[in-house]
Amino acid sequence: MIPKPIIIDISEWQDPQQINYDQLTAKIDGVIVRVQYGSNYIDKHYKTHIKEFQKRNVPVAVYAWVRGSSYADMKQEAQDFYQRAQQFDPTFWWLDVEEQSMKDMRGGCEKYRKKLKDLGAEKVGVYVANHLYAQFNLATEKFDGVWLPTYGKNTGQYQGARPTTTNSYDIHQYTSKGKLSGYNGDLDLNQIVRRDLFYFFRQDHQISDKENNKEVEGIEMKTITTTATKVKLRSSPKVGNNIIVALGKGTSIKINDIVFGDGFVWGVQPRNDGKKGYIDIGKSVDWVK
């Protein structure tokens, strides 16, 4: 079984030349891209991966393997991570903690987390190896999310194996041998255990930079926030099976026009693929007499 929503995490080990992004993006709901391995090693393909996924309206989070050997080094790694990724406006920032690079990993990772926050990262989470969780004793309660791996038999599908070190986590990486259309190699697959997709992968990144905050089409670009638990973004201004995605409560999206159709008023969301999304913002009778 491959639980939905489907989240993958990738790095330079997944060569862009070997990926059919059109096929792969049709199968996934979000991606977490590696940016660096410590400060001194930059992932060869992180920019390409991010651009290709965002071009196809897949929300992108980022991660960095943590290798800081001192408090100062941890803060420098955070600085480098932020400078390398902030231009892409990732939905979430993850620390990947899989080795003991300094004695006080708890204190060091807290310095890293706080530096990212101070720089402007909205949400910062931590990935920590299951067998190192207790040893490192990270201050996970200060992070915005906890991501743990446990593979079981590692068959490429989820077969019930769960992290054993704690029950308090949000995302579970359940295999390193996943298979999806668009890439013939192995993929890390993840499932969301707590919260929902939109907490980790907001959708407002879908607005292209050239349109952001400019007056285009009918109205000046506006940001609206959903107040219901499931608000449907549709591919046309009418009620039916034309759903692009169901937005969670508190999701922000940008609109640049309003249209009338099917008895409703629709906010129009421009999208990077040149198409439009439509969100119901009220009944027509409430807007006109």
PLM ranges: what are they?
Residues 27-30, 56-58, 89, 139-147, ...:
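Glycine-enriched alpha-helix->loop->beta-strand junction motifs that scaffold or abut catalytic
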Residues 208-232, 246-249, 258, 285-289:
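SH3-family beta-barrel domains
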Residues 2-113, 117-122:
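Substrate-binding cleft of extracellular glycoside hydrolase catalytic domains
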Residues 245-286:
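SH3/SH3-like beta-barrel superfamily modules
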